[in-house]
Amino acid sequence: NTALFDVRLTVPSDFVVVATGEELSARKTLPGMMERHFVSGPVRDFVLVIDDDFQSDSLPVGGTTVRSWFNPGSANGGMNVMLWGAQSLTVFNRLFGPYPYTELDLVQVDLGNGAAGVEFPQILFIGGDHYAADAYTRRIPDFLEFVVAHEVAHQWWYGLVGNNQYLHAFLDEGLTNYVATVYFEEEYGAERYAYQANLNFKLPYLAMLFAGEGDAIVDQPTDSFPSQNVYGTMVYAKAALGFAAIRSVVGDPAFFSGLEAYADAFAFSFAIATPDDLRHALEQASGQDLTELWNHWFEAAEGLQDFSPDDLTQLRRDLGD
């Protein structure tokens, strides 16, 4: 659900505070201390990051300031994150309807448990380890840019449109992962889109299908998946392939107008979006019954109907895996 937040906190005067909403005032209280006052519009969470040595830079996108916050020594990565955040916001504003807030902050944060990014309203945590061009990011081209696009897309799918992330995780994570590749398509062209889709969706799904734990249903509660690996592959990769298949069937105008209508219907709403809501929005936009296609990708484990082991072999060859 959405809420309005009115938050006051007292911190050392030289600390930087990055928070959901907008800062209304900052006033001195005790020696060396400041009271900071933040208020938000309708958002689903309130989060803040406090640091004593953040640096920042920003770019305007329409009526929004996109600001990157980074640690000393990470200026290169921080500037790239700012640029990619602005580019992603521009693309998604056009495709899904305008981002409604005046600020979007991308913050370098040390994350654990394998996370590269975490979404919050108006604030995106970006894994600090990936700001440097280390061996991992060199091995996976465009990795950090993909993470940024994914997290920016969450401002629509989780931020504006709320869903039950436990029961139907694919509604935000799968859709967000798919439209992150659409960002590459819009910004760089069809070849980069295909590469990102093959690397991030098709390869992990086919590897699980033919060299891992097999297929599974996408739309099930998070703790019903047999392992974290199966959860990640189904919710982030197979679900994204499902949205790509739907787009292929209904065509771009219907697909993107359906997503925009879905976002508009649930923006700031106390209603929680369900899989049926998204399917109906795409059906209304396209004039097609998508029940069979939807069930095939999200409610069944029928991947062997679509792919063979030879597809995995060829894909690995193509990607140089």
Question: Can you name each region flagged by the protein language model?
Answer:
Residues 1, 72-74, 161-162, 221-229, ...:
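Flexible glycine/proline-enriched surface loops and loop-helix/loop-strand junctions
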Residues 81-82, 165-173, 228-235, 268-273:
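Active-site metal-coordination segments of metallo-dependent hydrolases
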Residues 83-86, 91, 127-201:
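Zinc-dependent metallopeptidase catalytic helix centered on the HExxH motif
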Residues 3, 77, 81-88, 140, ...:
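Stable alpha-helical elements in mature extracytoplasmic
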Residues 98-100, 187, 191-193, 225, ...:
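Amphipathic alpha-helical substructures
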Residues 1-149, 190:
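Hydrophobic helix-coil surface modules that form long, contiguous segments used
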Residues 63, 124, 150-155, 209-223:
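Active-site-adjacent bridging/hinge elements
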Residues 109-111, 138-143, 215, 221-231, ...:
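Active-site-adjacent structural elements in folded domains
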